[in-house]
């Protein structure tokens, strides 16, 4: 499975129930095609950078997920045919560096420390532990 991020913007004229229904629909598209949603951000109603289809605002939603590449074609097709979707994007994270960035974004969305920070903390702890051992060995030999 590959790592992806998707964001879509819904029309501001939708009522809360319709927004929830659209979000759930796209989440189900991912999971029904054996995708795994790691986390999501419901960003709410925001001003658009520029007018889209006569709208100055839109409802933003972002999801970070893992899926097979074949599922992306269907997801994008469903975005395109839905008149309530003003804009969408699907970003694929491929290289090791990109996947690490994807994990950092997921961790930030979940309010967890990033994987890179955890690795640094573990390394730091290991180095300080080895230093303590060396110090205690040195003091016993005196």
Curated annotation (Swiss-Prot):
Top-level taxonomy: Bacteria, Pseudomonadati, Campylobacterota, Epsilonproteobacteria, Campylobacterales
Similarity comment text for this entry: Belongs to the bacterial ribosomal protein bS6 family.
Keyword vocabulary terms for this entry: Ribonucleoprotein, Ribosomal protein, RNA-binding, rRNA-binding
Database matches in CDD domains: bS6
One Gene Ontology MF term: small ribosomal subunit rRNA binding
Signal sequence interval, chain numbering: none
Source organism of the structure: Helicobacter pylori (strain P12)
GO cellular component terms, A-Z: cytosolic small ribosomal subunit
NCBIfam families xref list: S6
InterPro entries noted in UniProt: Ribosomal_bS6 (IPR000529), Ribosomal_bS6_CS (IPR020815), Ribosomal_bS6_sf (IPR035980), Ribosomal_S6_plastid/chlpt (IPR020814), Transl_elong_EF1B/ribsomal_bS6 (IPR014717)
Any single GO BP term: translation
Ranges annotated as biased composition (Basic and acidic residues): 110-133
Designated gene of the protein: rpsF
HAMAP family named among the record's database cross-references: Ribosomal_bS6
Protein name according to UniProt: Small ribosomal subunit protein bS6
Region (Disordered): 110-142
Annotated Gene3D superfamilies: 3.30.70.60
Its job: Binds together with bS18 to 16S ribosomal RNA.
């Amino acid at each position: 499975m590959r790592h992806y991020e998707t964001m879509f913007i819904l029309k501001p004229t939708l009522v809360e129930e319709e927004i929830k229904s659209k979000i759930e629909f796209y989440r189900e598209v991912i999971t029904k095609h054996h995708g795994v949603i790691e986390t999501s951000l419901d960003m709410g109603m925001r001003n658009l950078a520029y007018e889209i289809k006569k709208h100055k605002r839109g409802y933003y939603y972002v999801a970070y997920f893992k899926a097979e590449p074949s599922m992306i074609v269907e997801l994008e097709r469903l975005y395109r045919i839905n008149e309530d979707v003003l804009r969408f994007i699907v970003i694929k994270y491929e290289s090791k560096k990109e996947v690490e960035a994807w994990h950092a974004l997921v961790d930030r969305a979940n309010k967890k420390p990033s994987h890179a920070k955890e690795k640094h903390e573990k390394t730091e702890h290991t180095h300080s532990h080895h230093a303590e051992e060396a110090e205690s060995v040195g003091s016993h030999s005196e």
